[in-house]
Amino acid sequence: MDNKLIFHDSDTLICFLEIDEIEFLKKLFTNIIIPEAVLMELNVNNAPVNVRDNLNDLISDNFVEVREVEFASGEYIKNKCICEGYWTNGRPIGRGESAVLAFAIENEGIVASNNLSDVFEICEEYGIPILTASLMLAFAYELKIYTKSEINAIWCRILQETYQILPKQTFDEYYTELFEKDCNVLLKNYDFKKHYTVSKK
């Protein structure tokens, strides 16, 4: 199986950057790709200091790769159409989400985002898998990178220490009630566990 490229939106990264869970990201991924628009969103002046510092440290370590939407490229045209609402009945989409979607469509990749209200419709249309923070946490448990109690603790910290929203109050509830459905509906049954195994070789 050839691994798909995963393009990360700001909201999934904030879940872990804001609570200083850098090691979680490093254990689950070999690298992270973000568009320049996502970098700008995460580096704004009102962003939490540790979000900016953690992100910039990961960029300095070459763990996070920043990609620019090149003028007149396939990504550029798609990004412009999505951002200005041409593909969503006139409803504009944020710059970060638009760029992530454009890269994922052009490269037949994966969108890592919690912002389903913005990305789900277009991902459905183009058959693009979606990887949420909830799915990341569940796979970290399934792959035995973390124990269930450790994942529950991270889940709780995200809800208590960030403004990010998770679909259930506890990881146990999510894993029991929604994980299988999300693998089917959002991730489109993409084998992330095999993706992890291949990427970590």
Regions found by a protein language model. Name each.
Residues 94-109:
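Acidic, metal-associated active-site segment
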Residues 8-14:
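Metabolite-binding pocket within alpha/beta catalytic cores that recognizes anionic/polar moieties
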Residues 5-6, 110:
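Structural motif
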Residues 1-5, 16-31, 40-54, 60-61, ...:
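Feature 3881 marks metal-assisted phosphotransfer/nuclease machinery
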Residues 8, 113-114:
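Short beta-strand scaffold positions
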Residues 63-89:
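Acidic catalytic patch
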Residues 11, 37, 116:
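Anionic group-transfer/hydrolysis microenvironments
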